[in-house]
Every structure is written in structure tokens, then in C-alpha cells.
Amino acid sequence: MEAIGIHLNNIYKTFLHRVKGEVKAVNNVNLNIEHAKLVTLLGPSGCGKTTTLIMVAGFEQPDKGTIFLGEENVTNLLANKRNIGFVFQNYALFPHLSIYENVAYGLKVQKIPPQEEKQRVNEILAMVGLIGYEAQFPHQVSGGEQQRVALARAIVIRPKVLLLDEPLSNLDAKLRVHTRSEIRRLQQSLNMTSIYVTHDQEEAMAISDRIAIMNKGKIIQVGTAEELYFQPNSEFVAKFIGRINTLPAEVQEVDSGFVIVKIFNHAYKIPTTSDGIKPQQKINVFIRPEFIQLSKKVEENELKGIITEKVFLGEKVEFTVDVYGCTLNITSYNAVEYAKYLLNQEVGICLPGKELKFFKKKGD
């Protein structure tokens, strides 16, 4: 299949809400997706990710902006002229058609000759592991198998791009993990440019070449899973991707390559650009749970805390620690620490300065 890029330029979409009035569902979205890459739109409910997807599909028109599939401007092109494969959240299978007929539906619309139709349907059914299911109907197969039928129907037409709107939301947790791996395998083997929509951060991190974080109709940050996790550009992204702790701090000293902050009367040197940060400024500092280190003895350069909860999760242990009224979540991948530390035990808390982050607030 020929892979093409997808380019969204200054996309706006407003809907009229009977209570809220005009709602900006999509607000100046710009996104470039390279050919054969899978990009996920990730964000909370109502952030504009599905609206963006259906505008790429042609089911809605943007109020402003342009959509390109490769070199072709498809902004005003009808959905059925765009040659796009779409996998719906509820699969949208035809209940009165067999599995074979569901998968072949798009080929019949395209008036593909019967012999070629049969060859292409069988080829796709083999790829998704549904050989032998041809005569069955949607209600006779499992949710995971229905999802694979929907995926097969979307890709059998050899679309320019593949769009997936929360395709795993109706599956149980274990099946979601297996099915997302299958989707990724197919997408890569077919070199198919794809946009995937989900609110599940783990799903997005597992399946994507890049992730576009959305909130309130805007794209906040685009990057790989690693970039978003380790280098978030805002408090919103830091909190949305993975777990993170928030600590109150005060700026003590500002230099060109670092900032010294005070957290509960302990000083920490944070390597960072310091634009707009001033001494005595109150800020929030953030750190991931796995970067915090516990010790049995409270050293001079450590915070003092009390363990209020501990949970054994096999390969890791989760601790909840009270630090001067502030709750910290701490993850240890050394399972023996579950027995090492007791509930209500006083512990030392080491915060590595290089793992601390802070973000300028708007208007600062």
C-alpha cells in the first residue's frame, strides 16, 4: 500500500451547545504525520480528539483550516471520495451480513471484480486470524473478534490512511493489550499512515510512533512516549502522562543553567532554563514516583516522612508517604522493600535534583 502523510493546518471547529452556546471543539490544531507512521490523539473526554479525527475522515467540515492527505487538499472533499479506512468505537458491523460479507462490503461499493474481491478478503482474514469465520455473523463471535472484523473491513479497501476511534474501549483489559499489539503489527506490516484516538495513556504509549496530547481543543505537545514522559512541556502533560508528585517550593537562587529551590526547608538544585523565574517566587515542583528514594535513616539532606500505605504489586512496590502534610507516591522496583519498610515507619526521602521539574504558569 502506498503510504502518504497527513497534514492539518490551522484547523478550527465550533459546535452550538444548547446550554453552553458556542463551544470550540477544535481550536487552531496543527499536526503533521509522516507517511507510514501511527500518531495517537490522546486527551481527556471532550478535548477535541474525535472531532479532529472525523474531520480528517470527512464526516465533518472544519470551520477554518486545511486538511491534506499527501499532496491533495481534501478539506472540502466528500468522505466517500477520500479513500480512508475508519474503525469505529462500536465497530459498526452489519448484523445481517456474515463476517465475509462485512469485510467485503467496501470492495462491493468499489465494484471490485468477484475474483479479486475473494482474494483480497481471504488475504485480510488471514492477516487478522479470522480464516474459518467467514460464514459466521457478528453476534456469533467475541468482542475481540468483532474488533478484528472491523479492522479487516477498514484495511481491505487499501485505504490511503487508517483512522481508529477508541477501537479497544469495549474490550476487557487483557484483550486490549493483545489487540493493540495486533493493530500495531498490521499497521507496520502494511506501512499504513494512521491516526489513533484514545484517552488511555498506556495504550497510546504502547502503540504510537508519536503522541499528540490534546486539551480543550488544542494540541498541547507532540512527541514520542519517552519525550512526553521525561520532557513534558507543561503541568498538564506531566500529570496526564504517567503518575507524578507535586511539591510546594520557593525559588531561592536563579542562574543561567539552574534554579535552587527550597522544599520544606531543604535546598535543591534543579538544572533548567530559568527564563521568567525570580527569587522568592512560589512554584510547584514535580517528580515521578520511581525517582524518589527511601532510606531507613533520615540523613541531613533528606526530607522526613511517614509511610501511610504500602502495596505489593509483584515486580514493584507502591508506597504512600506523608511528608509534612504532603502526600508522596513512591514506586520501588525492588520488591524486597515491601518487607523492609513498615506502616507508620519514619523514613528518609531523597529527591534527586536532576529529576525535579517545574513549569511556568501562564502569565508568569
Model-derived regions, located:
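Helix-to-loop junction immediately C-terminal to a conserved catalytic motif
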Residues: 57
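Pre-Walker A (P-loop) beta-loop-beta motif of ABC nucleotide-binding domains
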Residues: 29-40, 94
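Conserved ABC transporter NBD signature motif
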Residues: 65-73
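The feature captures the beta-strand-to-loop junction immediately N-terminal to the Walker
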Residues: 42-44
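Non-catalytic connector elements of ABC transporters
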Residues: 244, 254-364
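ABC ATPase nucleotide-binding domains
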Residues: 79-85, 89, 93-239
